[in-house]
Curated annotation (Swiss-Prot):
Site (Important for dimerization) residue list: 175
Name of encoding gene: hemF
Recorded metabolic or biological pathway in which this protein acts: Porphyrin-containing compound metabolism; protoporphyrin-IX biosynthesis; protoporphyrinogen-IX from coproporphyrinogen-III (O2 route): step 1/1
GO biological process: protoporphyrinogen IX biosynthetic process
Residues annotated to bind a divalent metal cation: 96, 106, 145, 175
A GO term from the CC aspect: cytoplasm
Region annotated Important for dimerization, chain positions: 240-275
Protein name stated in the entry: Oxygen-dependent coproporphyrinogen-III oxidase
């Protein structure tokens, strides 16, 4: 089947609506929408929930940008895109909870297509989801990864292990020599065997995110915590900022190509702290995190 960008866009708009409704149902607070237009072509809907009952900040962004030619920074690595018009669309979200026992989560699904008259379109899907706990609970990690594994199952036995490894490799802070969290799924450049198969997988990932995340939120949101846990949460959020500004390809691409800065940086936590040469107390729950986030088979 020929790639159908309109069909993908409708799914993404509906996905943004559904996820916002699900997060509001858990939190009680409403999202505020900020619709925007891109001068060079396209636009989006940025939605943010702030200071809710459960979530300190949750951002769910839809964007659809298009243009007559790709920026040079994009075609340098993919010369086949030169001289083609393009469309790029996706839903990206990050949730930063109040309670340090509730992990931060991130998800993204996206579609890209580049066309020129007389030639086959170049297209692919990408996306995934990952979890960043501050305090490790094995049952949460197992649930997260089993949900990821189960949604991958209909698409092949090798899909989950391949995209889990890609996620582990991608969300890695080289300058800290540590993982950002416990991973999940990450895929990109997906265009085989055909459009329908790839689109179905992207839909499964988009829908699977809340199946993986919300049961963990419900399990942890009422746990008592104090200043020690809050300070550790803010300290560990620093790693999130470091990754996004130093290593994340999507953030860098967006900023380098004139993307909408407010939407790109919507993933940043509202509060964060750094502490020089911080060392958690031996044997403490805080010290246990470094071992918990090491790559392992959670399935």
């Amino acid at each position: 089947m020929k790639p159908d960008a309109h069909q993908v866009k409708q799914f993404l708009l509906n996905l943004q609506d559904t996820i916002c409704q699900q997060l509001t149902a858990v939190d009680g607070a409403e999202f505020v929408e900020d619709s925007w237009q891109r001068e060079a072509g396209g636009g989006g809907r940025s939605r943010v929930l702030r200071n809710g009952g459960v979530f300190e900040q949750a951002g769910v962004n839809f964007s659809h940008v298009h243009g007559e030619a790709m920026p040079a920074s994009a075609t340098a690595h993919r010369p086949e895109l030169a001289g083609r018009s393009f469309e790029a669309m996706g839903v990206s979200l990050v949730v930063h909870p109040h309670n340090p026992y509730v992990p931060t989560s991130h998800a993204n699904v996206r579609f890209f297509i580049a066309e020129k008259p007389g030639a086959e379109p170049v297209w692919w899907f990408g996306g995934g989801f990952d979890l960043t706990p501050f305090y490790g609970f094995e049952e949460d990690a197992i649930h997260w990864h089993r949900t990821a594994r189960d949604l991958c199952q209909p698409f092949g036995e090798d899909v989950y292990p391949r995209y889990k490894k890609w996620c582990d490799d991608y969300f890695y802070l080289k300058h800290r020599n540590e993982q950002r969290g416990i991973g999940g799924l990450f895929f990109d450049d997906l265009n085989t065997p055909d459009f329908d198969h790839c689109f179905a997988f992207m839909q499964a990932v988009g829908k699977g995110y809340t199946d993986a995340y919300l049961p963990i939120v419900e399990r942890r949101k009422a746990m008592a915590y104090g200043e020690r846990e809050r300070n550790f949460q803010l300290y560990r959020r620093g790693r999130y900022v470091e990754f996004n500004l130093v290593w994340d390809r999507g953030t860098l691409f967006g900023l380098q190509t004139g993307g909408r800065t407010e939407s790109i940086l919507m993933s940043m936590p509202p509060l964060v702290r750094w502490e020089y040469d911080y060392q958690p107390k031996d044997g403490s729950p805080e010290a246990a995190l470094s071992e918990f986030i090491k790559v392992r088979d959670w399935g």
